[in-house]
Structures are given as C-alpha cells and as structure tokens.
Amino acid sequence: MGIYQLCYLKMHSGMLFLAGHTEDKEKETLLKALSDVMDAARKAMAGKSFARSPYRAPISALAAGAAAALAYLEQGEREKMREEILTALNAAAK
C-alpha cells in the first residue's frame, strides 16, 4: 500500500467519523478529528509524485471538505458542517 493510499484511507475514515458524530461529540473531539484529516492531506500533498497520483482528486476533495467543515464548526453550524463532509465524501468516491 502506497503513502497516498494510506493518507486517503486515514482521511476517509476521519471524515466518516465526523459525518456520523457532528451532533453528539464535543467540539474539541471534532477539531481533533478534522486536524488529523488535514494532517494526512498535508502529508500526501507534500509528496513528490502527488501530482501524478490517482489519489490526487479524492485527497483534494476531502481536504477541501475538511477545510469548509472546520469553518462551519467554528461558526457553530454543525448541520452545514455535516453537509460539507458528506459532499466531500461523495466527490471523493467518484
């Protein structure tokens, strides 16, 4: 398994956790999960061959969704946060 696949799997599992727990978890827990997703994205995007990776589009979609979700979490809009996460998961699946 390559580094990009590992980063994608870490991001995807983190986003699935977030999608299922936007309403029932503490803000700090959600921030930690989003931080883990963004750290995996940074690690993947720093790779030399990221531009040629088949995981480039899904990783980018999940990173964009995580960034938008973070903004909504900071504003206290958890339902919009969940919608962004689900949209990112949908985009990454294509």
Task: For every predicted segment, state its role.
Residues 8-11, 15, 34, 38-41, ...:
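Generic L/I/V-rich hydrophobic alpha-helical segments across diverse proteins
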